[in-house]
Swiss-Prot record:
Forms homooligomers. This is High osmolarity signaling protein SHO1. GO terms for cellular component: plasma membrane. PANTHER family: FCH AND DOUBLE SH3 DOMAINS PROTEIN, HIGH OSMOLARITY SIGNALING PROTEIN SHO1. Belongs to the SHO1 family. The gene is SHO1. Residues 34-42, 87-101 are extracellular. It holds the Pfam family SH3_9. Glycans are attached at residue 87.
Length: 304
């Protein structure tokens, strides 16, 4: 929000309206000065000076590129100025015997027209047809004309960029996950005692797991470490590793294990499971038939 003359001269609407307003104000002040002060309405002097202050304020806001931040304030101030200028016109227009008053009335009429234009512009939405038409003549692209509010085209462009970044992030995540799964299965085929340093995460398409972050991956446990001995080469076989499962859980939903993941187990809704190691998104679980594997934590609920 630094001072720059280019903020003002780059906007034809600002230059044209303020130039028009300055000419109308000069006509008004000249007519007021040439009028018979005994008959001239004294309150009109206040209205004329108030109009000058408004124009100075608008000029400063354009120079500092902060016009958008005060548009609602300007609408209120301009509404007052519109009342002043129209009221002065009503008192001056019928004083046909005084040319000075008629000149001042002409200036007040012009100021009333200007105030009405400003009210419609500053009070209008940036996406309205009138505002977009006026802003299209600006030499600067979205500099001060509602520059703080993105247009519909900008929103669409931003959305496309976000989608592209999200797609790249998703593709990268999928590639990393596939690489980790391949390494994990390679180690499982060679030895059951070899620890895998890369944390194992899978089935990220499940409901409730879309928003996990990289910190969650680093904090998740190694499901293939020596202390658990939970490597399963056949999901259809019944296994019992002898581990102690300290908790009971109830399945909230039915879940079908990923056929490409040998560690996952399937279960039905309301099925009772024995679970352990419940500090991550995937829990070690045991079914009633003795099958042991991992289950997504958001599909089950711990029982008291």
């Amino acid at each position: 929000m630094s001072f720059s003359i280019s903020n003002f001269i780059g906007d034809p609407f600002a230059i044209s309206t303020l130039s028009f307003g300055l000419i109308a104000w000069i006509i008004s002040i000249a007519g007021a000065g040439a009028s018979n002060q005994d008959k001239f309405p004294h309150f009109s002097w206040w209205g004329i000076m108030y109009q000058l202050v408004i124009m100075v304020v608008i000029t400063v806001l354009y120079l500092y590129n902060t016009i958008e931040l005060y548009k609602f304030t300007l609408v209120g101030l301009l509404s007052i100025a519109f009342v002043y200028s129209t009221n002065s016109t009503n008192h001056l227009i019928y004083k046909t015997g005084d040319s000075g008053m008629l000149c001042c009335a002409a200036g007040c009429i012009l100021l009333s027209m200007l105030n009405l234009i400003w009210i419609l512009y500053f009070g209008g939405h940036p996406e309205s047809p009138t505002n977009q038409f006026i802003d299209s003549f600006s030499l600067k692209t979205h500099s001060h004309n509602h520059g703080h509010l993105p247009s519909a085209d900008n929103k669409a462009a931003d959305g496309d960029i976000d989608d592209e970044v999200e797609y790249k992030r998703y593709s990268s995540s999928q590639g990393n996950t596939q690489f980790q799964d391949n390494n994990l299965r390679q180690s499982q085929l060679t030895t059951n005692n070899k620890s895998v340093n890369t944390p194992y995460m899978s089935s990220s398409q499940l409901n409730g797991l879309e928003n996990f972050s990289s910190s969650d991956v680093h904090q998740s446990r190694d499901l293939t470490s020596n202390k658990r001995q939970t490597v399963y080469n056949d999901t259809n076989s019944v296994n019992d590793t002898g581990n102690v499962f300290r908790y009971k859980a109830k399945a909230l939903y039915s879940y079908d294990a990923n056929p490409e993941d040998i560690n996952e187990i399937s279960f039905a809704k309301d099925e009772l499971l024995e679970v352990d190691d419940i500090d991550g998104k995937w829990w070690q679980a045991k079914r009633s038939n003795g099958q042991v594997g991992i289950c997504p934590s958001n599909y089950v609920k711990l029982m008291d």
